[in-house]
Amino acid sequence: MTLLQNADLMTAIVTPFDDEENIDYGRLEYLTNYLIEHGSNGFVIGGTTGETPELTHDEKIELYQHFGEIVNGRVPVIAGTGSNNTKETIAFTNEVAQINGIDYALVVVPPYNKPNQRGMVAHFTAVADSVDLPIIIYNIPGRTGVKMAQETVVELSHHQNIAAVKQCTSLEELEYIVEHRDPDFAVFTGEDAQALTARVLGANGVISVASHTYVDQMRQMYDSLYRGDYQTAGKLQRWLTPRMAALFMFPSPSPVKAVLNAQGFNVGSCRLPILPLNEEEKRKLETALSLPTNSLTAKNLPLNLGE
């Protein structure tokens, strides 16, 4: 857990595309540097927010190579390598393990074929035993259709090559895992609205989507907590929570990309089957985020969207 000890606010970063839907590495570098400078201290590349289902194998390898060079060891980098095929997961993870600057592999609970708990243990054990990169469990039942039980996460936490979990379930389950995990096992919530509470409960932090657009406020929230200024930390979380929810009111990452484009990061559109927001959806998102009318179309938002 050494590299993850100081990583409390990690961003599940988008994949920028140009007008021809090629990956735009210049925009990726610009966004990455901005986020690091403003308090994000770790990244997931090639995750759900990075549109990994829409990337080819070769694109992922090239993306991870470029991203390792961009970050250059400044913060931990976690690359998505999971699938619902154990042998393919092992092969791809070992391929990614050869890339400089990739510190961990994010391995999702197998979607679609929906293994039971024994199958999950067998899958993650086989992967962890066979790869040259520490892995992080990605437990996101809302997308996979099946949930890894809290007891199963705890069981797997004792494997020497399973370093952490990104947990997208209830706070009660997160609390159980924090209480019963192996001491060297890191726990991150993948639910932005749980960011403050998870840290108070003893989790290591959050792997966030909202930190793209609210990195200053989230950094201030955690720093206020560490100073013992609970009133400010709580106020910030309450201010953030409805905005965090709004970033998922349409299929992700189209909302966060719309805001980033309006801020001048120019991360482009989404690949099919995810569509960019239409004008009606932009108006609804502006209202939910308390943004000026037509600001997402005019692309005149400031970098800091705070009060």
UniProtKB/Swiss-Prot annotation:
- Pathway, per record: Amino-acid biosynthesis; L-lysine biosynthesis via DAP pathway; (S)-tetrahydrodipicolinate from L-aspartate: step 3/4
The subcellular localization recorded is: Cytoplasm
Gene Ontology terms: cellular component? cytosol
Q: Please name the InterPro entries in this protein's record.
A: Aldolase_TIM (IPR013785), DapA (IPR005263), DapA-like (IPR002220), Schiff_base-form_aldolases_AS (IPR020625)
Q: Which reaction does it catalyse?
A: L-aspartate 4-semialdehyde + pyruvate = (2S,4S)-4-hydroxy-2,3,4,5-tetrahydrodipicolinate + H2O + H(+)
* SUPFAM superfamilies, per database record: Aldolase
Top-level division of the source organism's lineage: Bacteria
The answer to keyword Magnesium applying to this record is no
Which residues of this protein are catalytic?
Answer: Y138, K166
Query: Which GO molecular function annotations are given, in alphabetical order?
Result: 4-hydroxy-tetrahydrodipicolinate synthase activity
Q: What class of enzyme is it?
A: lyase
Name the Pfam families for this protein. Answer: DHDPS
Residues noted as binding pyruvate in the record, renumbered to the chain = T49, I207
Q: Which UniProt keywords apply?
A: Amino-acid biosynthesis, Cytoplasm, Diaminopimelate biosynthesis, Lyase, Lysine biosynthesis, Schiff base
UniProt KW Transferase keyword: no
- EC nos: 4.3.3.7
The GO annotation for biological process reads:
diaminopimelate biosynthetic process; lysine biosynthetic process via diaminopimelate
Q: Where is this site: Part of a proton relay during catalysis?
A: T48, Y112
Q: Which family does it belong to?
A: Belongs to the DapA family.
> What does the record note on quaternary structure?
Homotetramer; dimer of dimers.
Matching entries from PANTHER family are given as: 4-HYDROXY-2-OXOGLUTARATE ALDOLASE, MITOCHONDRIAL, DIHYDRODIPICOLINATE SYNTHASE
What this chain does, per the entry, is described as:
Catalyzes the condensation of (S)-aspartate-beta-semialdehyde [(S)-ASA] and pyruvate to 4-hydroxy-tetrahydrodipicolinate (HTPA).
What's the protein called, per UniProt?
A: 4-hydroxy-tetrahydrodipicolinate synthase
What gene does this protein come from? dapA
